[in-house]
């Protein structure tokens, strides 16, 4: 990545740039529209395998607008359509090109399927080698992960992109949680804590003036909630994933499913806060801050009502060795990472 203080030092932005949040559950691309506003395109990073025994069904699905590709006599339904089909038909297994924040080594078609979806989201570019910053996780502290290898796989996917005019992109990685600080903490001189609660990982960063002081990830986030809550109530993770979008963490649970989801949310947040406390303990000799430190949360798993309040409770109980200021959940928190990637690209040297 380029100089991480670039956003502070270079107020003029690059005219053409792209930001890409390549997450375990969501793929999001951010560009500027003609008016200079942020414009987003999103797809779910998932697919279904459908044997092509009945060509009529395949053709009907295609006519209905289901994104489909065909390979080796197998049809693949992509994105949101795949999730909806898996939810309505329990016999279908939803497959994921990424798991725990990284490319899924068990899915042999992950590279090709992700390439198709990401290239489609990028759409057309206006010049050759258009600068594109894409999100990568930090290495996990609770499982063995290889963020560098994952970043190279994503780089290869992006370098294989070609527009209709033959234009390419120039991909560069940026830490996912640092991108949130670029997106949401300009008013605090890019100083604060950020946590991206995605599908596969929680990514955390503490930065001062745009420079990361510590960062880490935890392989226990949205998918983990789905898996553990499903196990507790005897449902499928796909069912829990749908129910999770309806949960309100400010209200007492009234069903077994709600109780399981709320319990797993609290466990995930408590674990994250414990590791943040350790992060500050490890660097406290090298930093000195008496000011309040704002905390930004983003990502789809942070979307439920009451998430911010539950995080605040856990932070108070943990007695973090810094003065926590505002807990900020942006209105468009699902898009914060992609927005930060775009801002980094626009201000790169």
What are these regions (language model features)?
Residues 203-205:
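A structural feature that tracks compact, well-ordered secondary-structure segments
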Residues 23, 198-201:
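Short flexible coil/turn linkers enriched for glycine and charged/polar residues
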Residues 1-68, 73-194, 209-218, 222, ...:
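Nucleotide/phosphate-binding catalytic cleft detector across ATP-hydrolyzing
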């Amino acid at each position: 990545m380029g100089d991480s203080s670039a956003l502070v030092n270079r107020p003029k932005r690059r005219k053409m740039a792209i930001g890409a949040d390549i997450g375990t559950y969501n793929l999001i691309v951010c560009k500027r529209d003609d008016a200079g506003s942020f414009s987003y395109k999103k797809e779910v990073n998932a697919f279904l395998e459908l044997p092509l025994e009945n060509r009529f069904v395949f053709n009907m699905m295609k006519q209905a607008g289901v994104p489909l590709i065909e390979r080796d006599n197998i049809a693949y339904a992509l994105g949101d359509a795949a999730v909806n089909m898996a939810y309505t038909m329990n016999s279908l297994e939803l497959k994921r090109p990424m798991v725990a924040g990284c490319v899924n080594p068990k899915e042999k078609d992950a590279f090709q399927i992700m390439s198709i979806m990401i290239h489609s989201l990028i759409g057309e570019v206006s010049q050759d080698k258009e600068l594109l910053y894409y999100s990568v996780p930090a290495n996990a502290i609770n499982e063995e992960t290889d963020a560098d290898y994952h970043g190279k796989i994503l780089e290869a996917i992006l370098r294989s992109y070609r527009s209709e005019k033959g234009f390419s992109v120039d991909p560069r990685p940026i830490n996912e949680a640092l991108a949130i600080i670029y997106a949401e903490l300009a008013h605090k001189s890019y100083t604060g804590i950020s946590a991206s609660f995605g599908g596969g990982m929680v990514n955390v960063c503490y930065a001062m003036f745009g420079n990361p002081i510590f960062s880490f990830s935890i392989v226990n986030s949205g998918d983990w909630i789905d898996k553990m809550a499903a196990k507790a109530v005897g449902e499928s993770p796909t069912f829990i994933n749908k129910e999770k979008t309806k949960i309100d963490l400010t209200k007492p649970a009234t069903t077994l499913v709600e109780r399981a989801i709320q319990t797993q949310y609290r466990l995930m947040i408590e674990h994250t806060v414990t590791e943040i406390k350790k992060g500050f303990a490890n660097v406290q000799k090298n930093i000195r801050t008496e000011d309040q430190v704002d905390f930004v949360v983003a990502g789809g798993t942070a979307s439920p009502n009451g998430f911010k309040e539950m995080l605040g409770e856990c932070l108070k109980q943990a007695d973090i060795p810094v003065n926590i200021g505002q807990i900020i959940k942006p209105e468009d928190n699902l898009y914060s990472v992609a927005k930060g990637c775009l801002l980094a690209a626009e201000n790169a040297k």
